[in-house]
Amino acid sequence: MGETKKMICLVDGEHYFPVVKDSIEILDDLEHIDVVAVVFIGGTEKLQIEDPKEYSEKLGKPVFFGPDPKKIPYDVIKKCVKKYNADIVMDLSDEPVVDYTKRFRIASIVLKEGAVYQGADFKFEPLTEYDVLEKPSIKIIGTGKRIGKTAVSAYAARVIHKHKYNPCVVAMGRGGPREPEIVEGNKIEITAEYLLEQADKGVHAASDHWEDALMSRILTVGCRRCGGGMLGDTFITNVKRGAEIANKLDSDFVIMEGSGAAIPPVKTNRQIVTVGANQPMININNFFGPFRIGLADLVIITMCEEPMATTEKIKKVEKFIKEINPSANVIPTVFRPKPVGNVEGKKVLFATTAPKVVVGKLVNYLESKYGCDVVGVTPHLSNRPLLRRDLKKYINKADLMLTELKAAAVDVATRVAIEAGLDVVYCDNIPVVIDESYGNIDDAIIEVVEMAIDDFKNNR
């Protein structure tokens, strides 16, 4: 059966003590299981032994109680997992002591400590983390898709590069290459024609590593992944190989970039997490939203403006993040477009993945900040049929295509624009802090980088 696994059992007062005792003995009798401790997590209906010492003596195991029998002692569970270096936490409780929300919170705590969380018909295992990087590193991950994680990653890469840390980005995406692909954004000129040429070769030239290379002008390594688990693992990915390649590149710092809510299975020193204020609150404060938030050294909240999120909701998100992860720096932001080329005086057709409700703000910003005339806009960059419809509607009014480098930006938007004789300029999205009281986002990013470098040096 292999090595013996150390197990902590969670029990409640809704079961009679003899039933609990027999169940723990059944587990403890298994050759590969050693029940090292028990945590009482609540319930009083059938609780016959209230004294922790007596409970421990009768059970023959150390038993830990929280201060309030009506509340699950999450901190006690966490401390016990750490104290006993537990491999498995077995949940022998049931409703009404626990419900789905409470179990997900227990799972988030247990899994972050590297233990398995298991019950009668479920089993959650910790994230896969290959310890392969030979350079200081951070992860940039998100709590969902289309919340601006890649924009944050590209921006962070520029900030890190500007401060002379010589970074490279290892990005994984659903359209990434079969073998990890190096893009020397620091050396080659990435033009619309170049990207279209790559697309004609079968490359997904709007993949995240191309966006990072274009926007940040640094080395990137593109990888692929398929499937995303509840916790963040992927079904299959070649990003471990991508990380190993990054070890050999001419860079001194590695940024591992997630994909949607999926997390690269590579161990890093520190982590930045993006949370979309526009996401349903249940996806932030329930399921494994708290797990991802709990990983962060810096949380960047994106989409912090009406109509995507009310001021009240933004405050609610911020408050929850600080409750889950009080040590993390939290910065609320909005995105604003930044063309990487000159658009002044041009009649612009603007293609974006931004939600339709905020497009008007982006258009006004582009026109006032960069002196262009936006004659048409499509928010359907990730919907090819609707994108083609919008391009057909506006293409004859424009002399320049301004597009984010995402989804169908190359194989549809760029191709249609070039065929129509339009210039093509790509557009970055810059996170802007909503209030200076939150501090400087560049400083916050560099603080995480320096913590990562210190960790790397101290653990060599």
UniProtKB/Swiss-Prot annotation:
Q: Name the UniProt key words of this record, in alphabetical order.
A: ATP-binding, Cytoplasm, Ligase, Nucleotide-binding
Q: Which GO terms describe its biological process?
A: gluconeogenesis
Q: Give the pH dependence of activity as annotated.
A: Optimum pH is 5.0-7.5.
Entry's localization field: Cytoplasm
Matching entries from InterPro entries are given as:
Cyc_diphosphoglycerate_synth
Gene Ontology terms for molecular function: ATP binding; cyclic 2,3-diphosphoglycerate synthetase activity; ligase activity
Entry note: thermal dependence: Optimum temperature is 75-80 degrees Celsius.
Q: Relate the assembly described in the record.
A: Homodimer.
Recorded protein name is Cyclic 2,3-diphosphoglycerate synthetase
- What is the species listed in this Swiss-Prot or TrEMBL entry? Methanothermus fervidus (strain ATCC 43054 / DSM 2088 / JCM 10308 / V24 S)
> What phylogenetic lineage does the species belong to?
Archaea, Methanobacteriati, Methanobacteriota, Methanomada group, Methanobacteria
User: Gene symbol?
Assistant: cpgS
